[in-house]
Swiss-Prot record:
Species, as recorded: Bacillus thuringiensis subsp. kurstaki
Chain segments carrying region 13 X 15 AA tandem repeats: 68-246
Keyword Repeat attributed: yes
Note: Encoded on an unnamed 225 kb plasmid.
Function statement: A protein probably derived from this gene is found in cuboidal crystalline inclusions, but is not toxic even when coexpressed with upstream ORF1. The protein runs anomalously as a 50 kDa band in gels.
Name of the protein in question: Uncharacterized 29.1 kDa protein in cryB1 5'region
Inducing or repressing factors: Transcribed starting in early sporulation and into later stages; not expressed during vegetative growth. Second gene in the orf1-orf2-cry2Aa (cryB1) operon.
Sequence repeats: 68-82, 83-97, 98-112, 113-127, 128-142, 143-157, 158-172, 173-187, 188-202, 203-217, 218-230, 231-239, 240-246
Keywords tagged on the record: Plasmid, Repeat
Amino acid sequence: MLKYHFPNVCEDELINIYSYGDFKGQGKYICLFKIENQSFLFWRNDKGNKIYTNLESISVEIINTNNTYNQSQNVCPQDLVDTYNQSQNVCPQDLVDTYNQSQNVCPQDLVDTYNQSQNVCPQDLVDTYNQSQNVCPQDLVDTYNQSQNVCPQDLVDTYNQSQNVYTQDLIDTYNQSQNVCPQDLVDTYNQSQNVCPQDLVDTYNQSQNVCPQDLVDTYNQSQNVCPQDLNVYTQDLIDTYNQSQNCDCGCK
């Protein structure tokens, strides 16, 4: 006979005994025995009686470690398979719900508190923010509009008068000084530029178009009429010329 133990199970730990899915009893674990290739569970029931049970027909659940040991050689009973799957792979529904609520979904009051504190400012802070950041107080808006976008009316009037519309006396002065010369300057200009003074006109006409009479006479006398001494050859020169051209000089 060989005595041995389940791994990591100590004596007197609380166990449940199942046979083909049916609950058979609860007791305290003592040890295991192996006799001629057969294994037996040695345990004590709730009445204190010591019992040997063949492990081939039972499965044992260690209560305090939540481990189930199926010692059958062929197939685990379906209820133990279900129990194992539920306890290992799938949490009981109440634990699943608790987990989902505590881990994935905050309780509604915490969600609300979070939303209010993190995502949504309290209404008074929202209002304060909107007023201080996004919307200026109305008096500041008015002041801003008046000082930035719209000049006070007296400044607008002053600007329009001084920038866009010249005062009438400046307009008149400008027109008179730039576009229209004063009449005396116009007259002077016309007289001095377009029409020469009469004495200059006369002088010009006399000096350019008509020579003075003495120059005309002198010119006519000097150009059209040879001086008397040049117009009439001396008689002795004429006679000499005629003799030299017309007379036979005796040369044959």
